């Protein structure tokens, strides 16, 4: 092997790294910004919770205020129940763990009409992935614990 080959290989690897890093958005903070989320199914595998959450860094390191809108969508087994809720939350990151504690701000929509208008706040304990593009862990409320997944809400460039 000639001395130039290792340099060429290193240059190729460096070039690929630069191209890939340019394709990924830069996040000044591990958590701040917009994320989408969903949970595993529940209620006889008929319902699921999903939503969009925005984290804003506070003056306290690794602490965030957050707001989100969640939707609980159920199928026929649960009378096609649909609940859309606005929630407020605080989040704290310790290492890779992120704990999100929420409170229901307002129930925005319930279908079918006449269904119960109560909703339990969606709380989460998740772990930030090493690429800072995803968080996985648990959703919990007073009735259940579910798997939860968060991913960055990044618009694709077309």
Set out the residue ranges of the language-model regions.
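N-terminal secretory signal peptides that target proteins for export/translocation
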Residues: 1-7
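N-terminal helix-cap/turn-to-beta initiation motif at the start of protein domains
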Residues: 25-36, 55-59, 127, 156-157
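Short, hydrophobic/aromatic-rich segments at coil-to-beta transitions
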Residues: 29-36, 61-67, 96-101, 133-136
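Contiguous, well-ordered beta-strand patches that form the walls/edges
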Residues: 69-130
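A charged, solvent-exposed segment within the mature domains of Sec-exported extracytoplasmic proteins
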Residues: 120-158
């Amino acid at each position: 092997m000639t001395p130039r080959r290792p340099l060429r290989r290193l240059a190729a690897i460096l070039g690929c790294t630069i191209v890939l890093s340019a394709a990924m958005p830069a996040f000044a903070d591990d958590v701040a910004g917009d994320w989408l989320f969903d949970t595993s199914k529940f209620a006889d595998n008929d319902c699921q919770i999903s939503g969009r959450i925005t984290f804003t860094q506070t003056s306290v390191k690794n602490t965030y205020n957050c707001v989100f809108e969640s939707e609980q969508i159920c199928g026929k087994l649960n009378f096609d129940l649909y609940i859309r809720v606005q929630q407020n939350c605080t989040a704290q990151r310790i290492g890779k763990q992120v704990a999100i504690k929420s409170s229901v701000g307002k129930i925005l929509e319930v279908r079918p009409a006449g269904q119960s208008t109560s909703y339990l706040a969606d709380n989460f304990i998740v772990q930030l992935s090493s690429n800072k593009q995803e968080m996985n862990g648990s959703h919990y409320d007073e009735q259940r614990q579910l798997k939860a997944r968060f991913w960055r809400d990044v618009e694709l460039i077309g």
